[in-house]
């Protein structure tokens, strides 16, 4: 649950703004929000950012005379975390950094809140509350090993299987183009994984017992859960069909791996949508897919709903191309197991 509150005070009037919105997972990183209207003399928070050390940079539109900020681990302000406020530029008082005194006070994936008040030299003030999720400063590295991109029937959902190349945390790592039209991407929750583990993301979820295996104590009871891999689940029951697609794994905007595939019977000369074409270009420009982003250089098989495409991960190989991938018919699909 994310909440963003802004209270503005001037010497003659009080204006209160409130904004409330929700999302499905705390693993999503905070986004910049603009809700500023009204008297242009009011102090405005024009931007804020969070870095890998959970330092929060605040940028205001006016020079600030007084600033006070605190960090809390709960929205009710009962768990105060020791923090410091530092001015970032000597020439002007518009940019400040709020930092933790003890970096271990906020772990990867932990929620925390920055609350503060600023005043300019005319007495105009701004009260603000921003919520964040502890940054992933130790991301794991994933490589795609198998994809079943089409849906046949319940409970056989589409899935993407990934091998952990470098141990670390999954928190905030995204899989692009595996969700709905409104929510096309999936974001992993906080979960520490070890090198050599297999991760399976099931695009759909039909069972209440299908739980994300964020640690070893959780065993998912989903119908197609793998006893050989760590299972994670989308919350969808219905998804658009993707016969041709560009799937990307990225962490903080950096592409880790990608797969580009197209249905050989469709004879498409271009990607079916601009979003897929952009994802394909991103995969190519990042250097993980070769030799181009064009659909002609994607994997070309007639992939039926019961089939998958897979490959054997080559150690220290950072680039992928269509020739590395093979079609696995229904009996050869190895969901959650090492590929043959």
Predicted stretch roles:
Residues 19-22:
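C-terminal motif of bacterial Sec signal peptides marking the signal peptidase cleavage site
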Residues 56-58, 158-163, 246-249, 309:
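Buried hydrophobic-core signal for structured, non-transmembrane domains
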Residues 61-86:
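Short, surface-exposed alpha-helix to beta-strand junction/turn motifs within ectodomains of secreted
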